[in-house]
Amino acid sequence: MGVKSDIWIRNMAKNFNMISPFEEKQVRKGIISYGVSSYGYDIRVSDEFMVFTNINSTVVDPKNFDERNVVNIKGDCIIPPNSFALCRSVEYFKMPRDVLAICVGKSTYARCGIIVNVTPIEPEWEGHITIEISNTTPLPAKIYANEGIAQLIFLGADDNICETSYADKSGKYHGQKGITLPKVDK
């Protein structure tokens, strides 16, 4: 699998609506950067957050998730010490069948003890990316809404495209809008 360049990313965003909204250059002045980079795309975090809380003393169960585990926050977000938040990308993605994207956190946040996790973005998946953020520090951590949070690296198939894409298998997170909580197929 080859890594896709800024030229490929711009072409796919402009001609195939792979990323919307799309920023064709890196925006950096006075903010945490976002937009096209040499071999990736820095995504922004929206102003919607779900921060985990212990006020209801429920168990976090991925098979039976209780929405009382989270508090909704709009705007910049303060994640409590040693806590966790869910959020989403500003951008909506439509992945090509022959491409997989891997997401890595931005070093600006990582150097502050803020760890970003996103599972691979599979071929033909589309939607807003649900982003998981951990504050590993003993201090509150600020996340800036509508600024960069992570970078997507696009990997293209060398030969054959996949037999079954995310859309083909009707993946449970396909077409998600907003923050999507855990789901288990029943």
Curated annotation (Swiss-Prot):
Catalytic EC class: hydrolase
Q: Which Pfam families match?
A: DCD
State the source organism's domain of life. Bacteria
| EC number annotated for this UniProt entry | 3.5.4.13
Keyword annotations for this protein? Answer: Hydrolase, Nucleotide metabolism, Nucleotide-binding
Residues given in the record as dCTP binding sites: K106, S107, T108, Y109, A110, R111, Q151, Y166, Q176
State the Gene3D superfamilies in the record: 2.70.40.10
**GO molecular-function terms, A-Z:** dCTP deaminase activity; nucleotide binding
| Catalytic activity line of the entry | dCTP + H2O + H(+) = dUTP + NH4(+)
Any single biological process term in GO: nucleobase-containing small molecule interconversion
Catalytic residues (UniProt)? E132 (proton donor/acceptor)
Output the CDD domains linked to this UniProt entry.
Answer: trimeric_dUTPase
Q: Which pathway does the protein contribute to?
A: Pyrimidine metabolism; dUMP biosynthesis; dUMP from dCTP (dUTP route): step 1/2
Q: How does it assemble?
A: Homotrimer.
Family of this protein: Belongs to the dCTP deaminase family.
What role does it play? Catalyzes the deamination of dCTP to dUTP.
PANTHER family xrefs: DCTP DEAMINASE (PTHR42680:SF3)
Q: Please report the name of this protein according to its UniProt entry.
A: dCTP deaminase
Q: What species is given as this protein's source?
A: Nautilia profundicola (strain ATCC BAA-1463 / DSM 18972 / AmH)
Q: What is the lineage of its organism?
A: Bacteria, Pseudomonadati, Campylobacterota, Epsilonproteobacteria, Nautiliales
